[in-house]
Regions:
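Short glycine/proline-enriched turns and hinge-like loops at secondary-structure junctions
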Residues: 1-2, 27-31, 69-71, 91
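A structural signal for short hydrophobic beta-strand segments in well-ordered beta-sheet cores
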Residues: 6-9
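Buried hydrophobic positions in well-ordered alpha/beta secondary-structure cores of metabolic enzymes
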Residues: 18-20, 36, 48, 78, ...
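Extended amphipathic alpha-helical scaffold segments
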Residues: 20, 125-129, 163-170
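Glycine-rich beta->alpha junctions and the first turn(s) of the following alpha-helix
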Residues: 58-160, 197
Length: 207
């Protein structure tokens, strides 16, 4: 990100003229405003709020993705876009602060979304194991299945606790970046473990 090629030329009136193309812009097809990173005078990495109504702002071709289809993803093309000084986000040369903060919130949201996926997998496992019968009884009565579901419960609520703790840290503005990173990593690992466990409960029918 710090190697951004989009150029922002400072003007005498304090405004900036931006030229470049930004890839993979979330909601690029319909958003009214974008956060764009550019190098002022080719050197100082800075963040700007770009409004769709600015002359020279165009959206590129929609990306066709395997997942996250509810979000429009397009390039945003900037051709001699004049941006007023008030649309500078933070300070010139301090855009990395904005960029890394965005990543922290993204990691937190990843942890929260995996928590929902895990709860869904847990519910499906409990339902299926109660419905499927082998040897005259539900497979939920078998020790191996009980162990798997119990392990899923423990992991799921460990994720939930970490997500709520991270939310509290963000609300308190304590800047615990390491906790946010840890939440995303642990949640991703635990979700993988839980999704693997549901396969062991449901067998090939899950596929």
């Amino acid at each position: 990100a710090l190697g951004a090629k989009t150029h922002a030329a400072r003007q005498d009136d304090g405004s900036y003229v931006l030229n470049g193309e930004k890839m993979w812009i979330t909601n690029g097809g319909f958003a009214d405003a974008f956060i764009v990173f550019a190098k002022v005078d080719g050197e100082q990495f800075s963040a700007f709020i770009i409004e769709r109504g600015f002359d020279g702002v165009m959206s590129g071709q929609e990306e066709h993705k395997m997942g996250l289809v509810g979000s429009s993803t397009t390039p945003v093309i900037l051709q001699d876009v004049r941006v007023p000084a008030k649309n500078l986000l933070g300070e010139v040369g301090r855009g990395h602060k904005v960029a890394f903060n965005v990543l922290n919130y993204g990691r937190f949201k990843l942890g929260a979304s995996t928590m929902g996926s895990c709860k869904l997998a847990l519910g499906e496992s409990a339902r299926y194991s109660a419905e499927r019968h082998q040897f005259g009884q539900p497979i939920a009565n078998f020790g191996a299945i009980k162990h798997k579901i119990g392990e899923m419960v423990t992991r799921t609520y460990a994720i939930e606790s970490m997500v709520f703790r991270t939310a509290g840290l963000l609300d308190a503005m304590l800047g615990e970046h390491k906790s946010i990173d840890d939440a995303a990593l642990v949640a991703a690992l635990e979700e993988y473990a839980i999704e693997s466990s549901i396969l062991k409960v449901t067998g090939s029918e899950y596929l």
